[in-house]
């Protein structure tokens, strides 16, 4: 996604030179979000020939030499560049001892899972995050028996506070999904998953959705600075990497946000769309900072969930609506200013809240907590 968008943005902004787009997968570029949102695929409607983009599929980058200004491919060819944009994305975190388990990151992953759904196997999903919930939804819709195993004590523990994640626990039960929290997988055996307490779960298939890490291992020894923790490319606020003429966008790169006073690593579609536009501007001589309001969406268990912004544990939580009902929102406030918003079945809240966050608007708590009052009307 991010690589394709970079190429398109460069042409839109007037770059007339050669563009080479390397893709590790052999398939034409496609949109990743539908892979978990129903295990479908969506090819990009991009005329690469018309854009005069040299699309090289099935070519993995294995090394970078900033001194020589070359990228080495898996076949050993050193490909020269004047400017380089790193958009290698992220790779799924694997489960030790579960080599036969399915991931859900690539087109091949989706193709491998389709017959599993068609056969209506008993499925065990490891991870109750966004991807786990979305695939559990698709599996239940296909008629599969589904068990979700989560090491934390609640769904979405890494993304949302306890009081919100707990509200989502009931969604699993309503959908007929057996959610097991506070436990981990000890072994994956033919036809079964064994938990650490000895419980055996029937499993015709196992799907692992416990997160992803930036795909930056190929940059070892290149001099490109990586975050010591998450191994993301440490881009600056113009999306420049630490070596000359190199930029980084999408899931593989983190950047400093002046808006939030933190370095952000965003593994979501909207970031892979917006970041390349800024990188293209700056690569062509512009000076545009990148400081978006993060946004993503998820469809799970019959609910449309949207999130915008970036919260911190110190932010004040403000509820809009009944969280036991079909539609509600949560606002996070910092010194009265809206910093983030989660909307369940309330897309207008999200649309208005995103604009309020962008302009740094402060909210009056009383009307903001009233779901009958438009969120924008609560702005001071």
Predicted feature descriptions by range:
Residues 252-349:
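Mid-to-C-terminal Rossmann-like scaffold of FAD/NAD(P)H-dependent oxidoreductases
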Residues 86-142:
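Glycine-rich dinucleotide-binding loop and its adjacent helix/turn
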Residues 1-55, 136-160, 352:
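Beta1-alpha1 glycine-rich phosphate/pyrophosphate-binding loop at the start
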Residues 99-121, 192-194, 200-278:
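FAD-site-proximal beta/loop scaffold in flavoenzymes
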Residues 64-79, 189-200:
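Conserved beta-strand-loop-beta-strand element in the redox core of flavoprotein oxidoreductases
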Residues 57-68, 93, 181-191:
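A conserved short coil-to-beta-strand element within the FAD-binding core of flavoproteins
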Residues 363-380:
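Cysteine/selenocysteine-centered motifs that mediate thiol-based redox chemistry or coordinate metal-sulfur cofactors
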Residues 39, 122, 130-186, 292-297:
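Rossmann-like dinucleotide-binding cores of NAD(P)H-dependent redox enzymes
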């Amino acid at each position: 996604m991010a690589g394709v968008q970079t190429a398109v943005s460069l042409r839109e902004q007037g770059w007339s030179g050669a563009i080479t787009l390397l893709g590790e997968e052999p398939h034409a570029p496609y949109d990743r979000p539908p892979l978990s949102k129903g295990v479908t695929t969506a090819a990009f409607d991009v005329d690469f020939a018309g854009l005069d983009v040299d699309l090289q599929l099935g070519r993995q980058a294995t090394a970078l030499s900033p001194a020589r200004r070359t990228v080495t491919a898996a076949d050993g060819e050193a490909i020269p560049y004047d400017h380089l944009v790193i958009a290698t994305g992220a790779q799924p975190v694997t489960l030790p001892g579960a080599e036969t388990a399915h991931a859900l990151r690539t087109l091949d992953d989706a193709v491998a899972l389709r017959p599993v759904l068609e056969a209506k196997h008993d499925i065990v999903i490891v991870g109750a995050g966004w991807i786990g919930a979305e695939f559990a939804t698709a599996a239940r819709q296909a008629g599969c028996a589904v068990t979700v195993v989560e090491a934390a004590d609640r769904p979405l523990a890494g993304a949302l506070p306890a009081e919100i994640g707990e509200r989502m626990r009931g969604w699993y039960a309503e959908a007929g999904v057996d959610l097991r929290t506070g436990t981990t997988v000890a072994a994956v055996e033919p036809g079964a998953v064994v938990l650490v307490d000895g419980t055996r779960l029937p499993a015709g298939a196992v799907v692992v959705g416990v997160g992803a890490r930036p795909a930056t291992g190929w940059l070892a020894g290149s001099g490109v600075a990586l975050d010591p923790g998450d191994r993301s490319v440490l881009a600056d606020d113009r999306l420049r990497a630490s070596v000359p003429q190199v930029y980084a966008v999408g899931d593989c790169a983190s950047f400093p946000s002046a808006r939030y006073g933190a370095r952000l690593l965003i593994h979501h579609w909207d970031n892979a769309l917006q970041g390349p536009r800024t990188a293209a501007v700056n690569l062509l001589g512009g000076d545009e900072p990148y400081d978006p309001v993060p946004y993503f969406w998820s469809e799970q268990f019959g609910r449309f969930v949207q999130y915008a912004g970036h919260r911190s544990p110190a932010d004040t939580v403000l509820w809009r609506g009944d969280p036991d009902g079909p539609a509600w929102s949560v606002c996070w406030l910092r010194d009265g200013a809206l910093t983030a918003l989660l909307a369940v079945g309330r897309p207008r809240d999200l649309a208005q809240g995103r604009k309020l966050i962008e302009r740094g608007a402060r909210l009056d708590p009383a009307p903001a907590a009233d779901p009958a009052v438009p969120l924008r009307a609560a702005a001071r």
